[in-house]
Amino acid sequence: MVSVKVLFFGEAFQLVGKREETVEFPAETDYEELRRIILEKYPALSKIEKVMMLAVDQEYANPGDRFELERFTEIAVIPPLSGG
Amino acid sequence: MESKDWVAGISKSDAGRYSRQLLVDDFGVSGQKNLKNTAVLIVGAGGLGCPVATYLGAAGVGTLGIVDYDRISLDNLHRQVAYKEDQVGQSKSQGLADNVKLQNSGVTTVVHNVSLDSSNAMEIFKNYDIVCDCTDNVATRYLINDVCVLLNIPLVSGSALRWDGQLSVYHYGPDCPCYRCLFPSPPDPSSVTNCNEGGVLGPIVGTIGSMQALEVMKIAAKLSTTLAGKLLLFDGREGKSRTIRLRKRDPKCAVCGDEPSITAPIDYMLFCGAGAHDKIENLKLLEPSVRVNVHEYQEIRSAARKQFLLDTRPPVEFEIAHLPEAIDITLNECRSLQAEELSSRLGVDSQTSDVYVICHRGNDSQRAVKLLKEKLGSIHFRDIIGGYEEWALKINDEFPLY
């Protein structure tokens, strides 16, 4: 397992109530597992599950992607904003 | 050679007017000429549309089209900086076009004072080279995306809420994704917060709108360093921005994929389950027996010695104004707190029979009554129809409307 910083943007911040938090993930993982762990740890995010993007080290994560996480990896939870 | 011969890359008047941007590397004379030959459509003449139109007009864009059906209101002015107090009540699209024209008479402006929908979008968009999404709602964002893909127009998309902004360029180049590649299905309407509910700071929309104008100038000047395929996240509270590299175009995308299923605009209100505006919906979640109107509540509170009133609004709104008997317990707290905690915060005991619930406009109060009934079954919870807004309109015109 490895501790990784998870960042919450926009509505994800509103739902979780934190800008960032350190979360434990398996060092070798994939997109599906990242999503599952994040949604289990932060059930409030289920509200935006359909539109929730994940980015790993500032790169959009696609279904099926595999990741080797390290101590300085950053995972961002990004829902779209629609106001203007 | 005569002394009056010269080779002109640009007219004398344009050289004089735009000299400071002609001097910028990689923009220069060719960028200026390209910008002058470009027609840009701005959809939404609000907090984003104001800076986009103002900067593109000033920079000398050839044609600027502005779509908006709405009128200027007083609570727009803190962020929609192109408008003046004496324009309240007037058309936004006309007001913004007038403003651009006043600043730079060389720009051709086109006013589209309509509500953009599936029936008119293709006809409006087809005359433009670049489209800017400066709108405030999800349904219109999908409509704009689809029409840009169908007509093969690059889309410069900005959005903002509270302290945050997002910016990207969609459908620009063969690998560039569209909005649907990223969000194939729309958000649950109950999870979408708009600026009317969540608020937004002027400089946030100002920053994102200014950057949208800059992306348009780069596309017009044919520079390769645009935000196509990238998403810029701006966090104004922390003063940080991050740029995320996005996925490539999805070959299975319903509109820009290899075998698209969307070949003409669809019904976006049906698709999103929400209207094409950012106005507040009037929900009816409760039976009339568990609701009172503001007149009834006024009688109840003047008759009773002690009245229990639960106020579901967030602390920032509670601070703007509240009734003296109101106890602030937010909708989220109604959801998360246990029965005992709720009772003690409210100050109710086993003798208490009635508690009234109020919010800003009467939607969250209904959601709260449903949650509270589950947790404190012995108490009769009722919501106040229309909330503080109705109270201000019908009972006390001194109470702040916001």
From Swiss-Prot, chain A:
Pathway: Cofactor biosynthesis; molybdopterin biosynthesis. GO terms for cellular component: cytosol; molybdopterin adenylyltransferase complex; molybdopterin synthase complex. InterPro entries: Beta-grasp_dom_sf (IPR012675), MOCS2A (IPR044672), MOCS2A_euk (IPR028887), Mopterin_synth/thiamin_S_b (IPR016155), ThiS/MoaD-like (IPR003749). It is found in: Cytoplasm. HAMAP family: MOCS2A. Acts as a sulfur carrier required for molybdopterin biosynthesis. Component of the molybdopterin synthase complex that catalyzes the conversion of precursor Z into molybdopterin by mediating the incorporation of 2 sulfur atoms into precursor Z to generate a dithiolene group. In the complex, serves as sulfur donor by being thiocarboxylated (-COSH) at its C-terminus by MOCS3. After interaction with MOCS2B, the sulfur is then transferred to precursor Z to form molybdopterin. Heterotetramer; composed of 2 small (MOCS2A) and 2 large (MOCS2B) subunits. This is Molybdopterin synthase sulfur carrier subunit.
From Swiss-Prot, chain B:
Its cofactor is Zn(2+). It catalyses: [molybdopterin-synthase sulfur-carrier protein]-C-terminal Gly-Gly + ATP + H(+) = [molybdopterin-synthase sulfur-carrier protein]-C-terminal Gly-Gly-AMP + diphosphate; [molybdopterin-synthase sulfur-carrier protein]-C-terminal Gly-Gly-AMP + S-sulfanyl-L-cysteinyl-[cysteine desulfurase] + AH2 = [molybdopterin-synthase sulfur-carrier protein]-C-terminal-Gly-aminoethanethioate + L-cysteinyl-[cysteine desulfurase] + A + AMP + 2 H(+). InterPro entries: MOCS3/Uba4, Rhodanese-like_dom, Rhodanese-like_dom_sf, ThiF/MoeB/HesA, ThiF_NAD_FAD-bd, Ubiquitin-activating_enz. Residues 303-400 form the Rhodanese domain. GO terms for biological process: Mo-molybdopterin cofactor biosynthetic process; protein urmylation; tRNA wobble position uridine thiolation. HAMAP family: MOCS3_Uba4. This is Adenylyltransferase and sulfurtransferase MOCS3. The gene is moc-3.
